[in-house]
Each structure stands twice: as structure tokens, then as C-alpha cells.
Amino acid sequence: MTATSSQEVTRGATRHDGGRFRRFRTVTKWLLLGLVLLLTLGLAGSLINHWVKTPREESAYPPPGQMVAVNGHRMHVYAEGEGEQSLVFLAGSGTTAPALDFRGLYRRLSDDYRTVVVERAGYGWSDDSGGVSRDIETVLQETRLALREAGESPPYVLLPHSMSGLEALHWASRYPDEVAAIIGLDPATPAAYESSPPPRLKVALVTFMSRTGLLRLVPSLCDGSPSVSHLSEEDSEAYCSLMYRRTMTADVRAEIDVTQANAELVAAEGVPEVPFYAFISDGEGLIDTWNEILVSYAEAAGGQHQVLDVGHYVHSEAPDLIATEVRAFLEQLVR
């Protein structure tokens, strides 16, 4: 074969390879465009479904408690029981339906106590605050006013879950006469946030899924919640509805942004002198030192604690045990 013939063969092979590459690139481009189109249509369908269902669900599942005016917005306060001691339940960060989330526990206590759940702005049936600061002092004043407007009066036994442990400790420091005791349901203490920055990526992802209705495509998130096992079918539907449309609201995100600052303020106030009992989870899914921090705090407070072999939502996973212990603890206080 001459040099010229060899060059022609090479050019032919190159043209052939180039043609195959262009065809591959074209096919890939159309596949990607098709995928983008499918995702766009799917997202649009999810949004439309969400927009249609949301007002229907708001009408179908009205608030079971009182709506009271606080600081330019309305807050939902649910209460039952007529006992002399008032137990006030405070929800952890992102709990979408506190009035239903705590039901497994307060239904086991409301025969003997006044049980009250305050839903902070942006939670459950409460309105969004409209941009009002979520610093711990503002949140506490709103909680106190909501209780007063709902006809409740201190002193209160506070039962905070998770992040609201900070609010309970701040409350006891600022207004000791209003807090008879703190019974923490795997409550957070300031040290839990010293080296725990906000999970911004997770917050952004969950916010996107909530706003676009994509959470509705994952019903296991609701059905698998330990709280649902304590609810009727209708209340379970209301719980799921609130989860789909009230997860990661603007107020919840604002709370997360100021959590570390709130923790620093509470830490500076020291350990309040108030009867203290902490029910502590197995720590799964939390920071590695969660249990150690809580045990240390309970001991520093001169209080009691019990480590349970259950997840973070201790009040839903071990309500019988906790109700029994709450009664025994409160009976000791009045002797």
C-alpha cells in the first residue's frame, strides 16, 4: 500500500469515527433533554397536585384547639384535662403537628392533670409569624402570651422535646415562679449545639420537597412516624396533611438559623434551680455525645434522668413508662 493510500484509509476511518461520535452526542443530547422534560413535567404535576390539595385539607382538618392572637399572628393552643397541675408540652425543631405528636403521652396524663400543647409560629395549625424574630426571648414571650390568652395560668410543669429544651431552661431562668419543674423528653441543652452547625443542605432539600409537594410522594415519612400509632384514622390523616404542607416553614428555618445563638444565651444564664427530670433516648441519629451531655446536665442540675432504649421521639415510643414516671416524679414534689 502506498503512503497516499494509507493516508486515505486513515482519513476515512477518522471520518467514520467522527460520524459515530456526532451521532452518539446527538442521541445523548436528546436523551438528556427528554429526561429534563420528564422531570419538569413531573415537578409541575407535583406542584399542581399540592396546590389543589392544600386548601381542601385546610378546610377538612380545622384546628382542634384555640387560635389566639399573639404578636401579630395567631397561635394554636390545645388543652385537655382538668387537674390542678398544668403540664405544658413544647415541641422540638421541625415537629409539624405538635398537638397530635404529643397525644400518645398527654392522653395518658390528662385524667389527672391539665395538659396543654402550645404550637409555636410556623408549627402545626399556628400561623407563620410573618418574619418576626425567632430569637429565644421572642419565642418565649409568645409562648407565655399564647397560654395566657388561652386561659391558662402558671406555674407550669414544662415538658420540652429536643430543641425546646433551650426554651424551657430560659423560661426557668427568666421566670422561676412560673416553672414548677422541667421534665425533658430527650431535651436539648446548650452544650449539644457547641459544635453542631445547622444542617443547611438537609434543610434546603426538605424545604424544596415540601414546597413542591414532593413529600406527598413519600408517604412512608408520615406512616412510619411513631406518633401515628397513637392517632385515630382521621387524626392520622390530619397529621400527614400537616406534614406535607407545614414541614420546614420559614419560621422553622429561622429558628434553626439562630439555634446556636440561643444556646449561647441559655448557657450564659447557668443552670436554673428547678426540679429536673430527663428521659434520654438511645441517641441514634443525633450527635455522638448527646447522651453524655444530657446525663451530665441532669447531674449538674441535681435532677434525675433515665436512659431509654428508644429513638428521639421518646414520648411516642415509650409513653406508658414516661407517664408512670411523670406521675411518680410530680407526686414527690408535692409531698
Model regions and ranges:
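Alpha/beta-hydrolase fold catalytic core
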Residues: 2-87, 110-113, 151, 295, ...
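Catalytic active-site module of serine/aspartate enzymes centered on a nucleophile-bearing elbow/loop
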Residues: 300-335
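Conserved hydrolase catalytic core segment
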Residues: 153-196
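Conserved HGGG/HGGXW glycine-rich cap/lid loop of the alpha/beta-hydrolase fold
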Residues: 73-125
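Active-site loop/turn elements of alpha/beta-hydrolase fold enzymes
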Residues: 120-123, 187, 310
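Conserved serine/cysteine hydrolase catalytic core
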Residues: 231-300, 309
